[in-house]
Amino acid sequence: TVDTSHEDMIHDAQMDYYGTRLATCSSDRSVKIFDVRNGGQILIADLRGHEGPVWQVAWAHPMYGNILASCSYDRKVIIWREENGTWEKSHEHAGHDSSVNSVCWAPHDYGLILACGSSDGAISLLTYTGEGQWEVKKINNAHTIGCNAVSWAPAVVPGSLIDHPSGQKPNYIKRFASGGCDNLIKLWKEEEDGQWKEEQKLEAHSDWVRDVAWAPSIGLPTSTIASCSQDGRVFIWTCDDASSNTWSPKLLHKFNDVVWHVSWSITANILAVSGGDNKVHTHSPWHGGHSLLVFTPPTREGT
Amino acid sequence: MEKMSRVTTALGGSVLTGRTMHCHLDAPANAISVCRDAAQVVVAGRSIFKIYAIEEEQFVEKLNLRVGRKPSLNLSCADVVWHQMDENLLATAATNGVVVTWNLGRPSRNKQDQLFTEHKRTVNKVCFHPTEAHVLLSGSQDGFMKCFDLRRKDSVSTFSGQSESVRDVQFSIRDYFTFASTFENGNVQLWDIRRPDRCERMFTAHNGPVFCCDWHPEDRGWLATGGRDKMVKVWDMTTHRAKEMHCVQTIASVARVKWRPECRHHLATCSMMVDHNIYVWDVRRPFVPAAMFEEHRDVTTGIAWRHPHDPSFLLSGSKDSSLCQHLFRDASQPVERANPEGLCYGLFGDLAFAAKESLVAAESGRKPYTGDRRHPIFFKRKLDPAEPFAGLASSALSVFETEPGGGGMRWFVDTAERYALAGRPLAELCDHNAKVARELGRNQVAQTWTMLRIIYCSPGLVPTANLNHSVGKGGSCGLPLMNSFNLKDMAPGLGSETRLDRSKGDARSDTVLLDSSATLITNEDNEETEGSDVPADYLLGDVEGEEDELYLLDPEHAHPEDPECVLPQEAFPLRHEIVDTPPGPEHLQDKADSPHVSGSEADVASLAPVDSSFSLLSVSHALYDSRLPPDFFGVLVRDMLHFYAEQGDVQMAVSVLIVLGERVRKDIDEQTQEHWYTSYIDLLQRFRLWNVSNEVVKLSTSRAVSCLNQASTTLHVNCSHCKRPMSSRGWVCDRCHRCASMCAVCHHVVKGLFVWCQGCSHGGHLQHIMKWLEGSSHCPAGCGHLCEYS
């Protein structure tokens, strides 16, 4: 158990790329970063800047430095950066009309791109263009009523890498998935002209989609997305045939309560699911999709 | 967004029914007030003053109080209040400083009753005494508060705040003589109505103007104040010094604050700029509003709960010229939207999980907020179902290890560091890796390595201590040695005529075969029995005579001229392209129809996912019998690699790919291989295993992958003598024909780590230069350059 000293509910906790730091964010408007190496927990930074509950945090790939994005009920997205050991606000994006619920960094191969999903139904994409400048693209009305989650597809190159001489940037197809209050999961693809287009609509949930997680493509022959919803169901979506782009859902489990989060292990062989019962269930979605372990946080009795 | 629920509440005698609804007003509203029957609402503004009946489905205009052709400034209302005891009595505060009372009981169209023109500037607020029918209080921009007795023509008393304008005045609900007033300078004053000479108490509540205040309807002495500093504060006024109990931060300045009836900790707020929404806060959860009404398109100017004992109906007027009735049930509840849980998979397979602690846990274990410590009774109170969340919210953050006792992904790191991928014969690599896997408790992987070894190493080359692995428990040295002898002998005996010739005779070889299989079976049966005596003895005796031949088959002693001796391809470094020479396709044809083939195939297939040492042994046995060429297993190995990759063990897939090299490469399509490589390299880099990652890149057969570490590796070097760029390869300068890589300190040619200054091109052994720089910052070559090393 990590003592976060947050004064209100924690909405998200994310480990960085190397698994050495943990960022948490809370209703108390703060974002905290802990060093969790060797089982320790040292508070490195307490980031204040949001004026509302902070819903989600996301670490950027370390090749861009130590960068953390956070999104909040105050309609803002803040990008924090560590410079010489101190964390500071490096950019503030205030382009949404309502609470920003989810942030997710694109695979590092694409450059520094952040997708933000908001309750105003829009998804905005922030691309770093150098010298502290960010270019904003916005997908309006991506999800009616609101967007709850965004998750990038792993970087996959059409065709073989071999066609591209080294040094030249391969032509990636950028994709991400989003889940919203319209009970849908949508897949978005960047067109050649740089515009984002809805590529696919995945329909299976009967209530708000709370989280989507695109599986890391380590060793997997197929594209896989996990989604969870207010309706208590967790679906695994697979796309076996990339050319026809048809996705088929498989019900992993039906819980009796809202399922808030799905998270893949880095090798994508285990899916962790957290539900309204305050427990974490881990599943192996492959080979039968059996439940593995259930974790229950210790009660604070006697502390 | 159709959310039209209907709520009916019975409140002793009267029944409230309604739904979320709104009606258009002719002009922007400045203030609203509800009649005590909860059935009518008055809306006042600069150019509006109307009474609406609140019906079930809609608002119905009942009375327009703004009469006369040329309405006077007296009708331009900043505030309006409906008497809570007398249904016919209203008071308004006019922007010209006049306080007007209205009597709805008057028969004429003009209901205006009394006019008090005592204030010099805009009157911001009027307030009736909660229990005294004739007492009216006003607060004005001119800094004065006045108390009127409606039975008299002018004010009874005047209170001077001794400061700038008064923004709000409110009679205490419980204390008959007390009222609070708030000021533009951030102060709150408490007055006794009988003592106009000075205030009872004064304190600074906010930074900047305090726009509003509201006494708690039940809790004596709780006063909520709202200011331009975007904060709502709850004060306990019963103590000697006003004590701040709660503080709510909103996103815009707070214009109005109203406690929610029947919900002790709830209050509604609205802002005077930027934000058009109305929020209901639980003061114990100061960061997230409990409910939010988003109907208005412009600033909300007036809010009022419809009935003093009903928590579900809220009325509001706005600058957008609309009057709304909000149902709490229909409010959007940001708390409900909020994720109460955070979940993340760490790199090492650990899970970070933050979850909301239930109220129960909070009650038993945690200290409640300081503000609540005074009222522990709260926790025992049955929670109001109308409250969207139960009390305090806090989260516990736990980090779980997914593999109890183990380090999660620790095996990955260990394996990556310890696997041998090249530089040794295949068999040794397989053995080594099997051993590594077994030591890490990954038996299936270990078995796979052993299997690979058996499949791909021609039997004659199987070094000793082989079956040791497949049997599993690392037995004595003697027995496995004998076993492998036996196998070596047995396989050629069956497989080819020429080898048969070398054995002492047909009958003899048959016996050997039988014996050895018996041995194997014995071994299987008691795999745990280390060095069981019977077969060992037997073998020792039996095979003795063949030792010479066996040595001939050993790689070291193999005669190159011997045509049947299969050269160990594994002896070469794997990255070299070697033509795979299977022991002979004719053997396959020989035995293609033998029942052993299908049997072994089935066996191998069945054991691909979870094998035991039993089946493994029988397979290897079958293999030797049938002498299948490694090619035969290509498909199988491919499936096996796919299996591991799908399991998330891309490490295994890549390691096998590298170790087997050409043997399997052709069976797996280039793209998949590339994908595995990049995935594995990615993982290695995440674990900061740079050296392993580099080795994998180097060993990879895929061009796209191997070029990964060839990016930006060019070094531009200047000759240390003539200072010109070195154009040719090597360390000899074209121009001065001297070796450029001389150490400036010891004047020897540097081999290994060479460090040099980019300014003057001089450098030398890293150690020497470092030592030199401790004493001097000038170049050791004596060129006078102040060297810089980064």
From Swiss-Prot, chain B:
Top class in the EC scheme: transferase
Catalytic activity: S-ubiquitinyl-[E2 ubiquitin-conjugating enzyme]-L-cysteine + [acceptor protein]-L-lysine = [E2 ubiquitin-conjugating enzyme]-L-cysteine + N(6)-ubiquitinyl-[acceptor protein]-L-lysine
Residue stretches of each WD repeat: 72-112, 118-158, 161-201, 205-245, 249-291, 295-338
Known EC number: 2.3.2.27
Sorted UniProt keywords: Autophagy, Lysosome, Membrane, Metal-binding, Phosphoprotein, Repeat, Transferase, Ubl conjugation, Ubl conjugation pathway, WD repeat, Zinc, Zinc-finger
RING-type zinc-finger residues: 741-790
Binding site for Zn(2+) 1: C719, C722, C733, C736
UniProt effect for mutating S155D: Mimics phosphorylation, leading to inhibit mTORC1 activation
Binding positions (Zn(2+) 2): C743, C746, H765, H768
InterPro entries: WD40/YVTN_repeat-like_dom_sf, WD40_repeat_CS, WD40_repeat_dom_sf, WD40_rpt, WDR24
Top-level taxon: Eukaryota
CDD domains membership: mRING-H2-C3H3C2_WDR24 (cd16693)
Phosphothreonine modification, residue list: T581
Zn finger residue spans: C4-type: 718-740
The protein, known as: GATOR2 complex protein WDR24
Lineage: Eukaryota, Metazoa, Chordata, Craniata, Vertebrata
